[in-house]
UniProtKB/Swiss-Prot annotation:
It is a single-pass membrane protein. The lineage of its organism: Eukaryota, Metazoa, Chordata, Craniata, Vertebrata. Coiled coil: none annotated. Residues 11-22 have a biased composition (Polar residues). This is Alternative prion protein. GO terms for cellular component: mitochondrial outer membrane. The chain crosses the membrane at residues 40-58. Keywords: Membrane, Mitochondrion, Mitochondrion outer membrane, Transmembrane, Transmembrane helix. Residues 1-22 are annotated as: Disordered. It is found in: Mitochondrion outer membrane. This protein is produced by a bicistronic gene which also produces the major prion protein/PRNP from an overlapping reading frame. The alternative prion protein and PRNP (AC P23907) have no apparent direct functional relation since a mutation that removes the start codon of the AltPrP has no apparent effect on the biology of PRNP. In mouse and hamster, the alternative initiation AUG codon is absent and is replaced by a GUG codon. It comes from the Eukaryota.
Length: 64
């Protein structure tokens, strides 16, 4: 996200023009605060959950 001040493609608006000040606070803090730790935690646990689910589905499918 290096082009923070550049216009959004297709519009004349800038990334720094949110709908409201509350929107700016939410857009400025929530995604990064949420995506940071949560995504790392999810990425750390998801592969094992995904492998377990895939294996379970494979076993279920192989029985039919």
């Amino acid at each position: 996200m290096e082009h923070w001040g550049e216009p959004i493609p297709g519009t004349g608006q800038s990334w720094r023009q949110p709908l409201s000040t509350s929107g700016r606070g939410w857009l400025g803090s929530a995604p990064w605060r949420w995506l940071g730790p949560t995504s790392w935690r999810w990425l750390g646990s998801a592969p094992w959950w995904w492998l377990g689910t895939a294996t379970w589905w494979w076993r279920l499918g192989s029985r039919w």
